[in-house]
Amino acid sequence: MVKEITDATFEQETSEGLVLTDFWATWCGPCRMVAPVLEEIQEERGEALKIVKMDVDENPETPGSFGVMSIPTLLIKKDGEVVETIIGYRPKEELDEVINKYV
């Protein structure tokens, strides 16, 4: 299950392993489209990949620090370092390809 995180918990939740953060908002149509795709990927990948999401309206500090201007923005970190940023909706196959580069 994809976990909701906040500005306060971001560093702790994304500092180890392979982590994909979904920056989203409740009013964002493409964000609602990517949510079930991320749930499916999380279910398939299990412990190999952690997926978290952050509501940009409730938590403006973290997205601002990463220059998030459009949502959804998917930020992939490996052992605390940003390795990839994906902006906008992408189909599952494309997300799997990107994730596979870092597993």
From Swiss-Prot:
GO terms for cellular component: cytoplasm; cytosol. InterPro entries: Thioredoxin, Thioredoxin-like_sf, Thioredoxin_CS, Thioredoxin_domain. It comes from the Bacteria. Disulfide bonds join C28-C31. The keyword Disulfide bond applies. Belongs to the thioredoxin family. This is Thioredoxin. It comes from Listeria monocytogenes serovar 1/2a (strain ATCC BAA-679 / EGD-e). The lineage of its organism: Bacteria, Bacillati, Bacillota, Bacilli, Bacillales.
